[in-house]
Curated annotation (Swiss-Prot):
Produces ATP from ADP in the presence of a proton gradient across the membrane. The alpha chain is a regulatory subunit. It holds the Pfam family ATP-synt_ab_N. Keywords: ATP synthesis, ATP-binding, Cell inner membrane, Cell membrane, CF(1), Hydrogen ion transport, Ion transport, Membrane, Nucleotide-binding, Translocase, Transport. Its EC number is 7.1.2.2. This is ATP synthase subunit alpha 2. CDD domains: ATP-synt_F1_alpha_C (cd18113), ATP-synt_F1_alpha_N (cd18116), F1-ATPase_alpha_CD (cd01132). HAMAP family: ATP_synth_alpha_bact. Residues 589-599, 650-661 have a biased composition (Low complexity). The gene is atpA2. The record marks S373 as: Required for activity. It is an enzyme of class 7 (translocase). F-type ATPases have 2 components, CF(1) - the catalytic core - and CF(0) - the membrane proton channel. CF(1) has five subunits: alpha(3), beta(3), gamma(1), delta(1), epsilon(1). CF(0) has three main subunits: a(1), b(2) and c(9-12). The alpha and beta chains form an alternating ring which encloses part of the gamma chain. CF(1) is attached to CF(0) by a central stalk formed by the gamma and epsilon chains, while a peripheral stalk is formed by the delta and b chains. It catalyses: ATP + H2O + 4 H(+)(in) = ADP + phosphate + 5 H(+)(out). It is found in: Cell inner membrane.
Length: 670
């Protein structure tokens, strides 16, 4: 049954009064003012820069849309022209092309949907996945936290690299610069830090600026293989993309990381690298006719990098206590740290890790220069147990480097100095660490305690690599044996007595490794197989092939380091004694050579020595025997040079002369 309308409604429907009132209300809500949109025109375009006129009210960094769909952002604002940096290929952008404002600044999508994805600086997928949900976006240019909003950096950001965690600790919220020449392992060190966060609560953002596509692919594959890609975001602006995308890439990466920091989480940003970003900024500045300064960089290059890196901070507890750490990478030219961009970045950041090309060539990885590297947070963010265990590590290693330089003048007979050199060789073997072989904080503390106790002094440096590989499983087994059943979790790093016991047990592990290595050597098996078998016996881990495993622990490098005056004087006395002994032996050798020749006899031609009946030339044979088994320095003398020869007096003279030449060549090499 259809309901009957009431009387007033029926009357309105009959007269049309209600309809007229509704129409009048709708008309009152209509905006009758004209809607005008400013349209600009392209005056000229070249090299990814468009100069636009007619848009005087444009904001800095505002997104402009060209006819045909190409976008760009306002880079510089002049009275007559606006310099617009294109974010897409400039195909279709010509003179007199229409340009419209959007009223929005550059933004990038942010949120958990980015985790595990590879995107460009605008958030567009590069991995072939689905487009990202742009429900939550952040501007790429954001103000750095104020001083009152920050907290002290007091928590460590573990990298798993012993030399970094022990000597140059990085804290959560710190900015630590990684700087060095080309191909010295800068990216490798940063990727090791990312990979080590696979068991932590840190979100990692890797920003590639101007890198080769193949190099970026290797980085992504390494993180996917060894790390936790589901906790990483890759922002890629390769060398082939537009300069505008390369310029905004680090800002976009920081905005993505700030999303997690502002929600009480911890984030790490690796910018690879800021040297290429500075070159891109210089390119854009020169194209937009900005006045150049030092090394042709514009005057605001310091401000650009400062406002970027100041966004890394540890927030106060009132704001959630989140942190944003930064590992910017910079490249030097021939180790010149005094160049413009390196000095700027060193002054902006909270420390630097300097990688040396000579150490890298000597196969020391990571090639960290201990004398030039520093962390301005350091022990404030270091774990107390690790800080106590690494107290004298840097001083001992610096003194070893100077003593090692002295040993080139001759051997040292002082037992204390030899022990110090032995300790330094073990330190160098410990800090030489292959890629993707991260150590836990417990492993680092136990290794350093064993080093300080002298447990590692008696072992060969070649056994340090298998010791480092097998130590985690060894410690886990010891901890399991010391932990009662159903016992609550225990903080082993807070128990000094337990740490000392674990460090003492390292000696037993060293004995087993040495015995197994000796057995393998007797059987003629290569060292790599021995290390792999040791891993199977003690750690249950698979031996992983890596070229960095065979690091040369005996590489020498002269470095000027600070050493105590007493040690310097003692080393000088030792060197003087060795030099005087060498001079005495040289004089005796010359006298013996003169006495061994007949007066007036012409010196035989050493270029064509007399050949033995059934073998190589006698001089070569004697030289080989002398180099194969050379007597000690005190036993060398006239007897070694005047040994009887079955060939007679002439052959004796030839043999003596050959031995003297071998002696002189050996001394020259020393």
């Amino acid at each position: 049954m259809t309901p009957t309308p009431d009387a007033p409604a029926a009357a309105d429907a009959a007269t049309g009064a209600g309809w007229l009132a509704r129409r009048r209300g709708a008309l009152a809500r209509v905006a009758l003012a004209p809607i005008a949109q400013a349209i600009g025109r392209v005056e000229r375009v070249a090299d990814g820069i468009a100069f636009v006129s007619g848009l005087e009210d444009t904001m800095l960094n505002e997104v402009l849309r060209f006819e045909g769909g190409v976008t760009g952002f306002a880079h510089t604002l002049d009275e007559d022209l606006i310099s617009v940096v294109l974010l897409d290929p400039d195909a279709g952008v010509r003179a007199q092309t229409a340009v419209a404002r959007t009223g929005a600044v550059l933004e990038v999508p942010a949120g958990p949907q980015l985790l595990g994805r590879v995107v460009d600086p605008l958030g567009r997928p590069l991995d072939g996945g689905a487009p990202l949900d742009a429900a939550h976006t952040l501007p790429i240019e954001r103000a750095a936290p104020a001083i009152i909003e920050r907290d002290l950096v007091s928590e460590p950001l573990d990298t798993g690299v012993l030399i970094v965690d022990a000597l140059f600790t990085i804290g959560r919220g710190q900015r630590e610069l990684i700087i060095g020449d080309r191909a010295t392992g800068k990216t490798s060190l940063a990727i090791d830090a990312i990979v080590n966060q696979r068991h932590s609560d840190v979100i990692c953002v890797y920003v590639a600026i101007g890198q080769r596509a193949s190099a970026v692919r290797r980085v992504i594959d390494a993180v996917r293989r060894y790390g936790a890609p589901e906790r990483c975001v890759f922002v890629v602006a390769p060398a082939a993309c537009a300069p505008g995308l390369q310029w905004i890439a680090p800002f976009a990466g920081f905005s993505i990381a700030e999303y997690f920091r502002d929600r009480g989480q911890h984030a790490l940003v690796v910018v690879d690298d800021l040297t290429k970003h500075a070159a891109t900024h210089r390119e854009l500045a020169l194209l937009t006719r900005e006045p150049p300064g030092r090394e042709a960089y514009p005057g605001d290059i310091f401000y650009v990098h400062a406002r970027l890196l100041e966004r890394a901070a540890k927030l106060s507890a009132a704001l959630g206590g989140g942190s944003l750490s930064a590992l910017p990478i910079a490249e030097t030219d021939a180790g010149n740290l005094a160049a413009y961009i390196p000095t700027n970045l060193i002054s902006i950041t909270d420390g630097q890790i300097v990688l040396d090309s000579a150490l890298f060539a000597a196969n020391q990885r990571p090639a960290v220069d201990v004398g030039l590297s520093v962390s301005r947070v350091g022990g404030k963010a270091q774990h107390p147990a690790l800080r106590a265990a690494s107290g004298r590590l840097r001083l001992d290693y610096a003194q070893f480097l100077e003593l090692e330089a002295f040993t080139r003048f001759g051997g040292l007979t002082d037992a204390r100095l030899r022990a110090q050199i032995t300790r330094g060789e073990r330190i160098r073997a410990l800090i030489t660490q292959p890629r993707f072989r991260a150590l836990r904080t417990l492993d680092e503390v136990v290794l350093l305690k064993a080093l300080a106790a002298g447990t590692l002094d008696a072992m060969s440096p070649d056994l340090v690599a298998p010791l480092r590989e097998r130590l985690p499983a060894w410690l886990d087994a010891r901890i399991a044996a010391l932990t009662p059943a159903l016992a609550p979790p225990r903080d082993w790093l807070a128990d000094d007595a337990a740490l000392d016991a674990l460090a003492e047990s390292v000696g037993e592990l060293i004995e087993r490794i040495a015995a197994d290595a000796a057995r393998r050597a007797t059987a003629g098996m290569p060292a790599e197989d021995a290390a792999g078998d040791i891993g199977g016996a003690f750690g249950g881990e698979q031996a992983r092939g890596d070229a960095d495993r065979d690091a040369d622990h005996g590489a020498n490098r002269e470095v000027s380091r600070e050493v105590s005056p007493e040690a310097s004087r003692e080393v000088s006395r030792e060197v003087s004694r060795e030099v005087s002994h060498e001079a005495d032996r040289d004089a005796a050798a010359d006298a013996a050579r003169v006495a061994g020749r007949a007066p007036g006899r012409a010196e035989p031609d050493r270029a064509v020595p007399r050949a033995m009946p059934d073998g190589p030339p006698r001089a070569q044979a004697d030289g080989d025997r002398a180099s194969a088994s050379r007597p000690p320095p005190d036993a060398r003398g006239d007897a070694a040079r005047t040994a009887p020869s079955p060939q007679g007096g002439a052959d004796a003279n030839v043999n003596a002369d050959a031995n003297v030449d071998a002696e002189a060549e050996a001394r020259h090499k020393r």
